Amino acid sequence: MEEVLEAAEKIRSMEVRGAARIARFAAETLMKFAEKASDEKFDEEMRFAAETLLNTRPTAVSLYNAINYVMRYSGESVEEKRQSVIRRAREFINWVETAQRKIGEIGEKRIKDGYTVMTHCNSSAALSVIKKAHENGKRVEVIATESRPRWQGHLTVKQLREAGIEVTLIVDSAVRYFINEVDCVVVGADTITANGALINKIGTSQIALAAKEARVPFMVAAETYKFSPKTLFGELVVIEERDAREVAPEEILKLGVKVRNPAFDVTPRDYIDVIITEIGAIPPEMAYIVITERLGYAGIEEEEITLNSRHFD
């Protein structure tokens, strides 16, 4: 169990970050744990491992979907169950890998030669769209936000430069100043709700608002495992608030200053032009169909929907 606790801490501390990376890491962790879990308490130990991982990042539905997918294992004997976990984990990991590639192929069609693209945070799905356009010979420049307070934008600019793409780094508060120099915005997603709203890195909704005002297309790159089945049943997405020390140094905190540090915000579907998924470019209104048909949650057993629900109240 020690390796599960270590993996959970890596997710909680954001040593492993990004919705896709978190989902894949969780699937890999469950697969490795299944190989070592005892025969006597296999189901009990697997469930404890799943709940431990689920309790780390409440907003990232990719984590929930990854764990729910792997935990739908089957088998009569313990060995059959063990092999089922391993097989399902590998299937999910393959889903992560192929989805990102397909999103790049579909999304790059909306990036024209000579475009300047704005992006926020560090989304592997969003960057796959930009990188694919560049690989296909299109001249693309990127304006990337710093994405405070965790500075994910620094990762983005490094990855773009490594790919040979011209990039300008700006502070988050300068988005509206630069929005008229942009041809489109491409961001990733932590969660897509049943009504088509986007939950993503704090600051995303302000970019969407600025883009709407400037009539700049706002596109979301999101794998279908980032769509939230829980919102189909009326549950609201919990917005994680992180440590005040990410925002302010101790000399400020010791003055008794109250600090709020939400990690995510909500962008209404009215501000989203299109969601680029591995199954196609869809309007946000189609999120309900993705959840019920692609994820198969229309009539699924209640146990699978409410796994570890006490952590999401």
Swiss-Prot record:
Q: What is its EC number?
A: 5.3.1.29
Q: Give the annotated active site.
A: C121 (proton acceptor), D190 (proton donor)
Organism annotation: Archaeoglobus fulgidus (strain ATCC 49558 / DSM 4304 / JCM 9628 / NBRC 100126 / VC-16)
**The keyword Lipid biosynthesis is assigned to this record:** no
List the taxonomic lineage: Archaea, Methanobacteriati, Methanobacteriota, Archaeoglobi, Archaeoglobales
Q: What class of enzyme is it?
A: isomerase
Q: Which UniProt keywords apply?
A: Carbohydrate metabolism, Isomerase
BP GO annotations: L-methionine salvage from methylthioadenosine; pentose catabolic process
Q: What else is known?
A: Reaction proceeds via a cis-phosphoenolate intermediate.
NCBIfam families xrefs: eIF-2B_rel, ribulose_e2b2
Q: Which domain of life is it from?
A: Archaea
Q: Which PANTHER family did the record assign?
A: METHYLTHIORIBOSE-1-PHOSPHATE ISOMERASE, RIBOSE 1,5-BISPHOSPHATE ISOMERASE
What's its job?
Catalyzes the isomerization of ribose 1,5-bisphosphate (R15P) to ribulose 1,5-bisphosphate (RuBP), the CO(2) acceptor and substrate for RubisCO. Functions in an archaeal AMP degradation pathway, together with AMP phosphorylase and RubisCO.
Write down the HAMAP family for this protein, in alphabetical order. R15P_isomerase
| Stated name of the protein | Ribose 1,5-bisphosphate isomerase
